[in-house]
Amino acid sequence: MVKAKEYEFDYWDGDRRYGYGGYKFIEGRWAPVAKALIDIYGLKNGSKVLDVGCGKAFLLYEMKKLLPELQVAGFDISRHGLSEARENIKPHLFRHRAQDRYPFGDNTFDLVISLGTLHNLRLHELETAVREIERVGKNKYIMVEGYRNELEQFNLECWALTAESILHTSEWIWLYNHFGYTGDYEFIYFE
């Protein structure tokens, strides 16, 4: 887990015991997700999107393929992840921690997304991250790992090398309400 939490080569492209075991670009892999986000949130050319914890930014790439004039930004803590982004997306990415204040004004983005990132923060770090997503986005969508029962909790604890906040879905919802989050959210489960 220590090696995985560095979020560098070993996490993304090293041995499977440290993370993804080879998170490679596959043309079109993220296209259905990109299209769904564009459709659900009514994005168009000129809209602004921020991806918090973008990793290799493959989703931003697919969104920009569908809407070439979409204004994208993304950040991650991983130098390796950012360096592996598609060339046309790299200029829009920077290294930053999700739990630190974001260098953007209020409501800068038409959509802020964070997929599979926030559960990697410690509980005391979540408040700033969630409040910043709320602050800079007109629309927001967060996806985290959660659990609904003991089996899913066990599976999540066994699988998640980097998760610091392993929470029941009711706890996530409580936190979102407590932090003033008004956006959309979703959970993934390990059944």
Identify the function of each model-found stretch.
Residues 1-41, 45-105, 121-135, 139-191:
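Class I (Rossmann-like) S-adenosyl-L-methionine-dependent methyltransferase catalytic domain
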Residues 116-120:
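Short catalytic micro-motifs in class I SAM-dependent methyltransferases
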